[in-house]
């Protein structure tokens, strides 16, 4: 039987909803969503589910549609099945059929009313910047290497805090979005430096198409003093999308988790499971940036 082929089911066959906590290394995927003539996380996961439950067409629904090259530490997915596999056995069963770049950390039974995307009350992303002098091969797949100057994370934090609340973020939305509007609520922001690594976390009710990477490009320009706060604020408040040109590369971005009104997974299987990096001894710090450009 071919994956996702549809057969007539007995009327008594119960349909169950399964929730998954999923990790993936996004470098070789076109993103979460199925695309013609490209390999997506959704396609690979659905094909694996169909091998275990071939009785019905499978649709895997995710909390966030990550772009090509973006990673996930705690993506949340649901699908409906009618086979006999207990909920808690789906994780090991799927991991035996998935490539090593996709791992299911936990599987739980959910009511039919629960939806991985629509029931989520927030999504949280982390962007990692490697701000050291020398390239590091083992950080390349997971971070953006900025080595020209030492980033001013204080300036970046000030800019981030100004974004909190319900705002129109048209300036940070790529063309091609199907959303009717560009308003969303940023609930929490955080920036942390650990030696040569800067980790920026942003949590919101939802994100626009390409929003985080466009925002990170602007923050790095701020941190390098190629952009000042006044110009940054004017760009997004006045919706000057044409002036927001540089998007941060995909490999530094990771979907940490999606949150719900109730805890769906155990904390160990879901919460902040992207590793923190330790580089050992750091090189001498980079020179600070020059004064910000005037507007």
UniProtKB/Swiss-Prot annotation:
Catalytic activity entry: uridine(38/39/40) in tRNA = pseudouridine(38/39/40) in tRNA
CDD domains (alphabetical): PseudoU_synth_EcTruA
Pfam families cross-referenced by the UniProt entry: PseudoU_synth_1 (PF01416)
EC annotation from Swiss-Prot or TrEMBL: 5.4.99.12
Record: residues binding substrate: 125
GO molecular function: RNA binding; tRNA pseudouridine(38-40) synthase activity
EC primary class: isomerase
DNA repair in keyword set: no
The entry's keywords: Isomerase, tRNA processing
GO biological process, any: tRNA pseudouridine synthesis
Active site as annotated: 67
Top-rank taxon, per record: Bacteria
Function, as annotated: Formation of pseudouridine at positions 38, 39 and 40 in the anticodon stem and loop of transfer RNAs.
Family listed: Belongs to the tRNA pseudouridine synthase TruA family.
Matches recorded under HAMAP family: TruA
Quaternary context: Homodimer.
Protein name (record): tRNA pseudouridine synthase A
Organism in which the protein naturally occurs: Prochlorococcus marinus (strain MIT 9313)
Upper taxonomic lineage: Bacteria, Bacillati, Cyanobacteriota, Cyanophyceae, Synechococcales
Designated gene of the protein: truA
């Amino acid at each position: 039987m071919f994956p996702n082929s549809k057969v007539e089911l007995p009327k008594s066959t119960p349909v169950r909803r399964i929730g998954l906590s999923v990790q993936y290394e996004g470098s070789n995927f076109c993103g979460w969503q199925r695309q013609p003539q490209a390999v997506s996380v959704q396609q690979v996961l659905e094909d694996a589910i169909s091998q275990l439950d071939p009785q019905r067409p499978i649709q895997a629904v995710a909390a966030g549609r990550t772009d090509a090259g973006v990673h996930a530490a705690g993506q949340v997915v649901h699908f409906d099945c009618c086979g006999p596999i207990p909920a808690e056995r789906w994780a090991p069963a799927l991991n035996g059929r998935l490539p090593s770049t996709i791992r299911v950390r936990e599987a739980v039974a959910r009511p039919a009313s629960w939806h991985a995307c629509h029931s989520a009350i927030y999504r949280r992303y982390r962007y990692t910047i490697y701000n050291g002098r020398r390239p590091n091969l083992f950080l390349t797949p997971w971070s953006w290497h900025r080595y020209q100057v030492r980033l001013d994370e204080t300036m970046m934090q000030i800019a981030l805090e100004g974004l909190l609340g319900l705002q129109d973020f048209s300036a940070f939305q790529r063309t091609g979005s199907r959303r009717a509007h560009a308003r969303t609520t940023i609930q929490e922001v955080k920036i942390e430096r650990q030696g040569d690594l800067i980790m920026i976390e942003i949590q919101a009710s939802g994100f626009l198409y390409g929003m985080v990477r466009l925002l990170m490009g602007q923050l790095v320009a701020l941190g390098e003093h190629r952009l000042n706060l006044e110009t940054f604020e004017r760009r997004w408040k006045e919706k000057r999308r044409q002036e927001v040109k540089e998007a941060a590369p995909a490999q530094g971005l990771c979907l940490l988790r999606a949150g719900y009104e109730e805890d769906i997974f155990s904390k160990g299987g879901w919460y902040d499971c992207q590793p923190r990096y330790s580089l050992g001894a750091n090189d001498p710090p980079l020179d600070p940036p020059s004064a910000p450009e005037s507007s």
